[in-house]
Curated annotation (Swiss-Prot):
Annotated protein name in UniProt: L-carnitine dehydrogenase
UniProt xrefs under PANTHER family: 3-HYDROXYACYL-COA DEHYDROGENASE FAMILY PROTEIN, 3-HYDROXYBUTYRYL-COA DEHYDROGENASE
Top EC class, one word: oxidoreductase
Catalytic activity field: carnitine + NAD(+) = 3-dehydrocarnitine + NADH + H(+)
Alphabetical UniProt keywords: Cytoplasm, NAD, Oxidoreductase
Primary location group: cytoplasm
One function term, GO molecular function aspect: NAD+ binding
Quaternary assembly: Homodimer.
Compartments, record wording: Cytoplasm
Taxonomy of the source species: Bacteria, Bacillati, Actinomycetota, Actinomycetes, Kitasatosporales
One of the record's GO cellular component terms: cytoplasm
Species of origin: Streptomyces griseus subsp. griseus (strain JCM 4626 / CBS 651.72 / NBRC 13350 / KCC S-0626 / ISP 5235)
UniProt cross-references to HAMAP family, sorted A to Z: L_carnitine_dehydrog
Keyword Transport: no
Amino acid sequence: MTVTPSAATTDGPAAPCAPEDVRRVACVGTGVIGGGWAAHFLARGYDVTAWDPAPDAAVRLRRLIAAAWPALEQLGLAEGASQDRLTVTSTLEEAVADAQFVQESAPEKLDLKRDLLARLDAATPAGTVIASSTSGYPMTDMQTEAADPGRLVVGHPFNPPYLIPLVEVVGGVRTAPAAVDWAARFYAVAGKSVITMEREVPGFIANRLQEALWREALHMVANGEATVAEIDASITEGPGLRWAVMGPMLTFALAGGEGGMAHMLDHFGPSLTSPWTRLEAPELDRALYDAVVAGCEEAADGRSIADLVAERDRGVIDVLRATGRLPRSAEEAAR
């Protein structure tokens, strides 16, 4: 899924090859996220060079990839995919010397990110797109020291990158629109589900939604209103099952019955001011009302409420079955 246009506003050099022609990927930073990226790229048939300053990085990386490989085999390996196509280098410069795409996954420290992206920019072949896995920093704040900021983009994954399809792509104010578009196309070719964001916002989309839930959960624990186990169960046994099939907006639209989101907002919109959360609620004005209703209609893509309900129900059953929580039939229970 892609939302366009990008937030980037300046022009810059194009990448040296088409996204479909990329064969060599560099992963800089090989912790949980960077190592997960390396596993994903290897499973998609790329040659991967990797570098991390930690003395035991190579051992930990190979162990992570080996542990992830059975799951990747179940997902389906690309032709030629092999763990043997990994090369761990002793320097950053070696890792990116002939890279056609670079994925940076260093720790979340702004000064570190700025310095590292500047080093990568200096060492990577001209025009090659460099993406950061940052989970929250806008690229505008990270690209300040780079000589060629036009090729720097955010490519934010979800953990583990080799299993969770989502990657959020967005540029900074000095990123070239062509670089954002190229990165989005490359990730799609590499098997990811891409959201190209219109504008920068700290935390991007999914992390901001997660953070809202996380903060409310912490409030409830701190106030003795719910235990950690109760909070987790409330999601895994409740809305989490629906969210695995369709997102929260379309799920709420179904709660409106045949009237969809418009009916939902008309009847439940006033509850936004109820003390159900410690987050301040937005004003449900006509612009927000219309945007939410129209967005749900677009997401439905012509499917009726009945069609969506059936799709949701099938998906929830599949999730329950996959997680071993599908209630047994009477015959099975009697055995």
